[in-house]
Amino acid sequence: MKSTRLILFKFLLLAMMALACNGLSGGDQPTVVTGSGDIALTVDNYRQLLGGVNNGGDPGSKGPSGYREINWDSLTDELAAPNLYAPDFFNAAEAPRARGILLDTPGDGLMVSADSDNPYGALPRFGNINPQYADIFKTFSEERLFSPVGSNIVNLTFFVPGTNQPAVVRGFGAVYTDVDTNHTAFEYFDQDGNSLGKFETPLSDNGLSFLGVVFEEALVFRVEVRYGTGALGPNDGDGDVDVAVMDNFIYGEPQPAN
């Protein structure tokens, strides 16, 4: 009888410890927002989770609430295809470019797609790289899109808008176009380089998808973004390579990193 009671006691103790651990970790779990197809309401829901106020492109931190958004459409032709995009364009000191984000890639560079009346004669929606893309890629906000060139990876780091002071954010989300296969889309890191989690975007062949993650606190120092399983190219379609590009970026108001 004593042996049975001891075993039962140990079982209950282990169960209580497991529940306690789950309770502690549960509060740290981020909110994940996903959608595909008609994603307008999904995107707006994500904005609301970040505070619902677009803090625009003014320098300085606007407090712990609100978000910054980039839709790429304000860029001039000189900064769009067939030309490369300046990685620090939205990390400028002055409005409206003071949005506190720096982009980098291990590839050849970054590119924003041409609009339909650009002076270079470049096809829109990355048709300058592969003419098929102009018909395949859709836009969420007209009419420019964003992608790395020579790689399918982009790293995002954050700054207090208008300064070179490193920052952290509560979350980051973005619109994908033409996601055909399951793959890790975002991996979030804190300022010590620890992974905060990997997340996949929903599928939407020739359509739009959205993935956004929100943490309880501003923890995100860097985000690694994967654009499909391969880089854009003139021979896309050969093999099992799935390419995808992006439209709007939405991220929490950057807060000074400790």
What is each of the regions a protein language model found here?
Residues 2-11:
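Bacterial N-terminal signal peptides that target proteins for export
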Residues 17-20:
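C-terminal motif of bacterial Sec signal peptides marking the signal peptidase cleavage site
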Residues 25-258:
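Surface-exposed, well-ordered secondary-structure segments
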